[in-house]
Amino acid sequence: ATQVEAPEQAPAAAPAADTESRKTLVLITTDTLGRGDDELGARLMENFLTSLPELGASLWRIVLLNGGVKLAATEGKCLDTLKQLESNGVSILVCGTCLNFFNLLEAKQVGETTNMMDVVTSLSLADKVIRP
């Protein structure tokens, strides 16, 4: 039988993707998740938001548009989760036009009120966009 010698040094592993520098943006356009029952959709949105920390350091920014801005102004688990994410360094942008439309500008409790140019720029800078 032929004997094969093992190399003196193991081959180098492929370099791991640098997840620290990757930018994941989450674009939320409604205050519920999915279509059908809004009560179920509200629960699903709570579960979605509380699962976001699992993305780790790549979670860079959350953008709230249209009905999604209600999450930044309505008391409840979603608002609490958004506040926690922001305190952990996640940037939250909230559409000012949308807040005005829903008369929520004064009620907003989390995030930075912003404009569409900032939203477009954020989308272009992100390595990955998640849209539930």
Where are these regions (language model features)?
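Short, well-ordered beta-strand core segments
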Residues: I62, S91-I92, K128-I130
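Conserved mixed alpha/beta catalytic, RNA-binding, or beta-rich assembly cores of soluble enzyme
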Residues: E5-E75
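Low-complexity intrinsically disordered segments
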Residues: T114-R131
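A glycine-rich helix N-cap at a beta->alpha junction
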Residues: C78-L104
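A generic structural motif
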Residues: A1-T2
